[in-house]
Amino acid sequence: ALLVFACFAFILVFGQWQSAMATLASVLVAVPIGIAGGLLTGIAAYRHPRFERALAPVLDMMQTIPAFAYLVPILFLFGFGPTAAIVATVVYALPPMARITALSLRQVAPEVRDLGRMVGATRRQMTWRVLVPSARDSLMVGVNQVIMLSLNMVIIASMIGAGGLGFDVLAALRRLDIGAGLEAGLAIVALAVALDRLSQAFAQREASALADRGSSWPARHPHVAAGLALVVATYLLGLLLPAFRT
């Protein structure tokens, strides 16, 4: 928590907050799409070997083609703006998640699969209730890769309308302003560290929540519940008392 606070404090103190929030907004859209797409693609590759053989060269191509090469077709299809930048980011960040998912599911212990068959789990239950939870630690490596690659794409995506910190770095490079470019670059690093720590903390909390599933949701997530209660309370106070609206 202190490290995450220090990262965001660094961004605020150096005046990069607005650009960082623009970058964070695009990353928070691209990362879930990349994770979900990679997870589903990896599960399909694990289930169907023929699909995996056909998918392998596609993933190789997505990972080896320079990012600049597919900016032009993305611009033609989606135009100049944040949408094109998010699409380019997803294309760049999805392949590692797909590969890690397929590999992680194969590495689940045979005893775990046998246990799922013994209790009569269907194919869907075997995948989502047995294999995926058992491979959570390995899958988190894929999640980390998606986050890091999404932030790695920030500067390149700024060329097609992403804005945010990537645009600040690009503008500083055009002006040869080393100081401004270094500040924006370090802000990207701080954002990456904060998101990585938050994702790891979320995974650990979910693992502990599985062991304490019998308790209520507010008891399992007291800080989130308190935050939501505070937001609702301040919103209601703003409706009742005009002084709270400002």
Language-model-derived ranges and their functions:
Residues 1-25, 32, 200-246:
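N-terminal, non-cleaved signal-anchor transmembrane helix
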Residues 11-17, 21, 29-59:
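Transmembrane-helix boundary motif in ABC transporter permease subunits
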Residues 26-30, 34, 38, 42, ...:
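Alpha-helical transmembrane segments in multi-pass membrane proteins
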Residues 29, 46, 59-93:
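Generic hydrophobic transmembrane alpha-helix motif, especially the helices
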Residues 37-41, 48, 52-55, 69, ...:
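Membrane-embedded alpha-helices of multi-pass transport/permease systems
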Residues 91, 124-156, 179, 183-190:
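Transmembrane alpha-helices
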Residues 97-142:
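Short cytoplasmic-facing helical segments at TM-TM junctions of multi-pass membrane proteins
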Residues 165-201:
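Hydrophobic alpha-helical transmembrane segments of polytopic membrane proteins
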